[in-house]
Amino acid sequence: MSLVALYTGSFDPLTLGHMDVIGNAAVLCDEVIVAIGVNPSKTPLFTAQERITLIESACGPLFASHACKLSVRLFSGLAVEAAREAGAQLLVRGLRDGSDLDFEMQMASMNRVMAPDIQTIFFPAAPAVRHITATLVRQVATMGGDASPFVPPVVAAALAQKTSLPS
């Protein structure tokens, strides 16, 4: 039986922190599914299709070096239902600090009640990426700052193009 992990998020944009979690999951699992949550009441910077393309492009080299399959998909609703539909046994989450731990433990407990057969595993963020959030990256980029230290190169290029002001 292969071990399949589901990693959910908005990934708007994909950050080096997300890449850290995906890389850790790739070491342990046979397949990692990156599931982009779609919330019709929010207006993301990148469209769902753009995020899929960026994740596939950024993660391609990582998965080429591991014996692990990557897939990217959209989902709406509960993460445990998305995991069940995808055949994933694991939900993977990253932890940057204590506030992440508090929130993620509550979510893991709720998910465990709803889906006892699906486990949640946590990866502590590497110190180099602990401070990165997609919200802050969007703010830096939309205010004309250089977001490249916080995102994969393909995402930095897309951010620069998306947020460039017309001359």
Swiss-Prot record:
Top-level taxon of the source organism: Bacteria
Name of the protein this chain belongs to: Phosphopantetheine adenylyltransferase
Positions of ATP binding: 10-11, 18, 94-96, 104, 129-135
Catalytic reaction equation(s): (R)-4'-phosphopantetheine + ATP + H(+) = 3'-dephospho-CoA + diphosphate
Cofactor needs: Mg(2+)
Any one annotated GO CC term: cytoplasm
Similarity section: Belongs to the bacterial CoaD family.
Any one GO molecular-function label of the UniProt entry: pantetheine-phosphate adenylyltransferase activity
Top-rank EC class of the record's enzyme: transferase
Example GO BP: coenzyme A biosynthetic process
Function summary: Reversibly transfers an adenylyl group from ATP to 4'-phosphopantetheine, yielding dephospho-CoA (dPCoA) and pyrophosphate.
Subunit structure: Homohexamer.
Site (Transition state stabilizer): 18
Annotated metabolic or biological route of this protein: Cofactor biosynthesis; coenzyme A biosynthesis; CoA from (R)-pantothenate: step 4/5
UniProt EC number: 2.7.7.3
Keywords per UniProt: ATP-binding, Coenzyme A biosynthesis, Cytoplasm, Magnesium, Nucleotide-binding, Nucleotidyltransferase, Transferase
Localization, UniProt: Cytoplasm
InterPro entries documented for this protein: Cyt_trans-like, PPAT, Rossmann-like_a/b/a_fold
Principal location listed in the UniProt entry: cytoplasm
Keyword Lipid metabolism: no
Pfam families with a match to the protein in the record: CTP_transf_like (PF01467)
Binding site for substrate: 10, 42, 79, 93
